[in-house]
């Protein structure tokens, strides 16, 4: 272990769509958590790794906490709360453009039993007038004994370096858990599937997003500069399959083009992406289907 090397695990907690994934991608400098304006975008805890010369922070981006309406929803909330027993610090992220609501209070109640340092992170300050920020800080200030309060813009990067510096100073001396050039502990197959699912969320209508899972069936390196990726998009109804395929296959082609570009950035090679769409009724409420589609809580 290096002398005076600080390391540890930090959970990012918050209501859906407060910008947790945007912050994580900002910190590690590459897209590993998918972003969308649709709720429940992040379904598994994704570990992003930030490393500098004398410190390493392993971030866990949890699914947004919400009132569950299906077994998948139960999994997502349990997944978010289970991280609180595993970490050295917690970032409680709130949206500066929204009033404090029941979802925030739900999280605050669960954080009252956490003995680790809790940071209040007020995100999206680039979207509000500075005068409003003081009101937001006052609204949250007495809800918990926060280690620090950081107003940030994950999108623009405002105050993100200062937040990282504070976390480094908070973490104990410890080992470097991962190599310096590693930014996540998830395999390429998992991230490729998430990038494809992001494009489905971006491009399809409201009916589809919560009913979509992606299984990457195969990643095969055909030569030194070419990678074949084969994946199946799983939906619950035939009508959703029709939306994703689109007229003459146009929508599926758009999804493929956009996803391929991001996968190429991740892999650093030319990618041939083949996509299929499969109907699997009620997969969100069947435990066996959840596990087959990658929702195994112990894995993350």
From Swiss-Prot:
Q: GO CC terms for this protein?
A: cytosol; plasma membrane
Q: Which cysteines are joined by disulfide bonds?
A: none
Please list where the region (G4) is annotated.
Answer: 123-126
Question: What are the TM regions of this chain, as residue ranges?
Answer: none
Keywords for the protein's UniProt record, in alphabetical order? Cell membrane, Cytoplasm, GTP-binding, Membrane, Nucleotide-binding, Ribosome biogenesis, RNA-binding, rRNA-binding
Location of the region described as G5 in the Swiss-Prot/TrEMBL record: 152-154
Q: Please identify the protein, giving its name as recorded.
A: GTPase Era
């Amino acid at each position: 272990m290096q002398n005076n090397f600080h390391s540890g695990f930090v959970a990012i907690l918050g209501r859906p769509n407060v910008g947790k994934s945007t912050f994580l991608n900002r910190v590690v400098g590459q897209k590993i958590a998918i972003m969308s304006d649709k709720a429940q975008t992040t379904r598994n805890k994704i570990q992003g790794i930030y490393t500098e010369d004398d410190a390493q922070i392993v971030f866990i981006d949890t699914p947004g906490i919400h009132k569950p309406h299906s077994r998948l929803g139960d999994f997502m909330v349990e997944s978010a709360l289970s991280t609180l027993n595993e970490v050295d610090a917690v970032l409680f992220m709130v949206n500066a453009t929204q009033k404090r609501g029941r979802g925030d209070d739900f999280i605050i109640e669960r954080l009252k039993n956490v003995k680790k340092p809790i940071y209040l992170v007020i995100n999206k300050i680039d979207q509000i007038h500075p005068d409003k920020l003081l009101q937001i800080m006052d609204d949250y200030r007495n809800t918990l004994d926060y280690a620090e309060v950081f107003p940030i813009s994950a999108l623009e990067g405002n105050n993100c370096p200062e937040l990282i510096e504070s976390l480094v100073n908070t973490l104990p001396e410890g080992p470097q858990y991962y190599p310096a050039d590693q930014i996540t502990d998830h395999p390429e197959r998992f991230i490729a599937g998430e990038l494809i699912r992001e494009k489905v969320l971006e491009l399809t209508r409201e009916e589809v997003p919560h009913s979509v899972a992606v299984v990457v069936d195969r990643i095969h390196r055909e030569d030194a500069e070419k990678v074949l990726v084969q994946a199946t998009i799983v939906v619950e109804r035939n009508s959703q399959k029709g939306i994703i395929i689109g007229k003459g296959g146009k929508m599926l082609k758009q999804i493929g083009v956009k996803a391929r570009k991001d996968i190429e950035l991740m892999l650093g090679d030319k990618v041939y992406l083949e996509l299929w769409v499969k109907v699997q009724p009620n997969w969100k409420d069947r435990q066996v289907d959840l596990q087959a589609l990658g929702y195994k809580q112990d894995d993350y």
